[in-house]
Amino acid sequence: MADAAVHGHGDHHDTRGFFTRWFMSTNHKDIGILYLFTAGIVGLISVCFTVYMRMELQHPGVQYMCLEGARLIADASAECTPNGHLWNVMITYHGVLMMFFVVIPALFGGFGNYFMPLHIGAPDMAFPRLNNLSYWMYVCGVALGVASLLAPGGNDQMGSGVGWVLYPPLSTTEAGYSMDLAIFAVHVSGASSILGAINIITTFLNMRAPGMTLFKVPLFAWSVFITAWLILLSLPVLAGAITMLLMDRNFGTQFFDPAGGGDPVLYQHILWFFGHPEVYIIILPGFGIISHVISTFAKKPIFGYLPMVLAMAAIGILGFVVWAHHMYTAGMSLTQQAYFMLATMTIAVPTGIKVFSWIATMWGGSIEFKTPMLWAFGFLFLFTVGGVTGVVLSQAPLDRVYHDTYYVVAHFHYVMSLGAVFGIFAGVYYWIGKMSGRQYPEWAGQLHFWMMFIGSNLIFFPQHFLGRQGMPRRYIDYPVEFAYWNNISSIGAYISFASFLFFIGIVFYTLFAGKRVNVPNYWNEHADTLEWTLPSPPPEHTFETLPKREDWDRAHAH
C-alpha cells in the first residue's frame, strides 16, 4: 500500500500486463468495462433470438422452426411440421438472458461499478476483491445459461421451453436437465448481483468525499444505491422460489404440486415479489444516467434535485407492494384486486415527478442535440408511452382482456427495450470518451439513434393493435387476420438488428481509430460531476488525494 500512495494523478503509466489487468482485476473501472463488454456479447445472442422469432412471425404459418430441422431460409416446397418446443426455447432464453444477463449487468454492474465510485470521489469500491468475484460469478451464470440452452430438455430436444418466469407445472415436469441448469444460472447471477449490491451500498455509505453529504451526491450514484437495496431485498426471494422448484424437480417435494398439497399460485406470488422490483432494478440506473445527460446538454442543473432523489426512493419502496398486478387473472379476491390496482397507479406519481422534472430541466435551457441527448429524448418519449400503457394494464377489468396478449408485450418492451436500452446507449455515448480516451464519430451516433428509434417503434407500436385485436403472446403461429401488423413489426426488428450491428461497428471504430480526447471534460461545464475532473481515460488509481469540495460542489465554489 505504501507503494501505491506514492503515485499521484500524474502517473499514467500502467505496468499491468493484459492478463493481469483483465482477468485478475480488482479495479472498479476495469470491472465495469468487463461487465459492459460481456453484457454486449450476451445482448447480441439475445437479439439474434429475437430476430429469429420475428422472422417466424412475419407471415402466418410456420416457415422456419420445423421439426424436420430449423432453417434460416423459408422453403415453400419442403414439408414443415411446427416445432413448438424450439419456439418456447427462443422465448425463454430471450427473456432470461435479456433480464438477468444483459440489462442489469450493463446498467448496475457496468456503469454502476465504473461511475458510482467516481461520482462520490471514492478511490475504489469498498470490497475490490468481492467486486472481482461478482463479475466472475456473472460470467459463470452466463456459461450455465448457455449450457442450459444446449443441454437435453423437453420433447427430446435441447433447451427448456417454459418461458422466462419458469412457472410450474411446466417447469417441474420439463424433462432433461436443461431446466436445472437454467435454475443454477439464475442462482449464480443472483448471487453475483447480491454481492455487487452489498459492495455498492457499503461504498456509497462509507466512502463519499469529504463534505459530500447524502443530499449532495450526484443522481446517478443515488440511483445505483437505491437499485442495490432493491437487489438485496428481492433477489433472495427469487432464490427461494427457484430453490423450491429445484426441490420439486429432483427431491420429491411438492411445494407447487396440488396433488401433494402444494400450490402453483404460491410460486407466482414469490416470483413476482421479486419480478416487480426487478423492473425498477432495471430502470432506476437508467433514470440516473438520463438525469446527467439532460442536465449536461440542456446546460442547466437538474430541476428539483431533492424531489428527484425522493421520487427514486418512493419508486423503490412502492415497487415492493404491487407485485400481484401481474396476477389479476389468477383468481384473487375483489379486495386484493382493488388494493393492487390502487397501489400500482400510485407508482405513476413519483414517476411523473421525475418525467416533469426532466422536462423542467430542459425548459428554458440551451439544448444541444448531441447523440447522448437524442437517446435521452428518445428515452423520455418512449418511457412515457410505456408508462401510459402501464396505467391501462393496472386496471384489473381491462387486464382481464389484455392479459397475455401482445398489448402486454408492447407495454413492457416500451419500458425495458425502449427505456432501459435507450438509457444504456445514452450512457455509452455520454461516457465512451471518458472510458476509452477516444470519441465516437458524431454522425454515426446520430444515425444509430434514428435507426434504432424508428426500428424499435415499428416493432412495438403495432403490437398494441395486435393486443387490442386479441392476439395471444408466446405462440408460434396465428390466424391470417393478424398478418398485417405482424409483418410491419418484423420489418422493425430487422431495422433494429441492423442498428445494433452498426453500433458494434461504431464501438470498435471508436476504440481503435476514434479521435483522441485530450481534455478531462469534452462536453461543457455543466457536466460537473467528479469524473469530468479526471483525465480521459482515468488513470489506474483515482482520487489517491481526496477531491476538494470545490471540485464537485458548484454552490460552494462560487
Curated annotation (Swiss-Prot):
Fe(II)-heme a binds at residues 94, 413. One of its GO terms (cellular component) is respiratory chain complex IV. Its EC number is 7.1.1.9. It comes from the Bacteria. Heme a3 binds at residue 411. SUPFAM superfamilies: Cytochrome c oxidase subunit I-like. GO terms for molecular function: cytochrome-c oxidase activity; heme binding; metal ion binding. One of its GO terms (biological process) is respiratory electron transport chain. NCBIfam families: CtaD_CoxA (TIGR02891). This is Cytochrome c oxidase subunit 1-beta. It comes from Paracoccus denitrificans. The gene is ctaDII.
